[in-house]
Structure formats: structure tokens, C-alpha cells
UniProtKB/Swiss-Prot annotation:
One of its GO terms (cellular component) is cytosolic large ribosomal subunit. GO terms for biological process: translation. Homodimer. Part of the ribosomal stalk of the 50S ribosomal subunit. Forms a multimeric L10(L12)X complex, where L10 forms an elongated spine to which 2 to 4 L12 dimers bind in a sequential fashion. Binds GTP-bound translation factors. Pfam families: Ribosomal_L12 (PF00542), Ribosomal_L12_N (PF16320). The keyword Membrane does not apply. One of its GO terms (molecular function) is structural constituent of ribosome. Forms part of the ribosomal stalk which helps the ribosome interact with GTP-bound translation factors. Is thus essential for accurate translation. Keywords: Ribonucleoprotein, Ribosomal protein. This is Large ribosomal subunit protein bL12.
């Protein structure tokens, strides 16, 4: 029996963040593509001075765990606390760095998350 597009979307919508991340990596490897957004040079040049102002007005940030640090258990606890992931998923996220912990958060929330992770001994980037 063939899967329909709706079946695929339903399956993907039921995946955890970690499972979805692994699926994306498999797609990248199998099809030789990248999930990273591409920048079009013409669009940047056409933006001119407005592009610089837009960069300053960034309101959504991603919190990326780059290193779980020597106290991995503390880092796993923080991951579980801020994401609601289960123990297994949080452990995998801590071991498979870099890992996006939260996406599209405010600067204040991103700074607070960074502080929590650094207190646990982890290294975090805000992008």
C-alpha cells in the first residue's frame, strides 16, 4: 500500500524535535542537500542600507547548545526543564552537539536560557 502525502505529514507531525532533527540529517545525507537557508546576493545588494537596519531589529533568536560541558547531568536537567523533552531525548540532545534547544525566542528569554546552561557548565550560542 502506497503512502499518501497526508500520511507522511501526519507521521512527521508526530515526531519529537530530536527525531525530526535526525530525519533532516538523513535527508541531507541521502539527497546531498542542506537544510540551511541560502542567501541570494541580489536581494542583499538591493536592500542596501535597509538591510543593516533589519539586522539590528532582530527579534527572534535561536538558542544552540554547543557543548554539554563536564557536568553533563546538570545540562540534561536544564534541557528537560526548558524543553519538556524526556530523559532519553534530552540525553541525546546533550551528546549530539551542536543542538538547537529553542527557536524563535525573544532576546531576554534567550539570554536567560544561556545563563541557565552556563550555570550548569554548558556552552551555548545565541543565533
Amino acid at each position: 500500500m502506497a503512502c499518501t502525502r497526508e500520511d507522511v505529514i501526519e507521521y512527521i507531525s508526530n515526531l519529537s524535535v530530536l527525531e525530526l532533527s535526525e530525519l533532516v540529517k538523513e535527508f541531507e545525507e541521502k539527497f546531498g542537500v542542506s537544510a540551511q537557508p541560502t542567501v541570494v546576493a541580489g536581494a542583499v545588494a538591493a536592500g542596501g542600507a535597509e538591510g543593516g537596519a533589519a539586522a539590528e531589529e532582530k527579534t527572534e533568536f535561536d538558542v544552540v547548545l554547543t557543548d554539554a560541558g563536564p557536568k553533563k547531568i546538570n545540562t540534561i536537567k536544564v534541557i528537560r526543564q526548558v524543553t519538556g523533552l524526556g530523559l532519553k531525548e534530552a540525553k541525546e540532545a546533550a551528546e549530539n552537539t551542536p543542538t538547537v534547544i529553542k527557536e524563535g525566542v525573544s532576546k531576554e528569554e534567550a539570554e536567560e536560557l544561556k545563563k541557565q546552561f552556563e550555570e550548569a557548565g554548558a556552552k551555548v550560542e545565541i543565533k
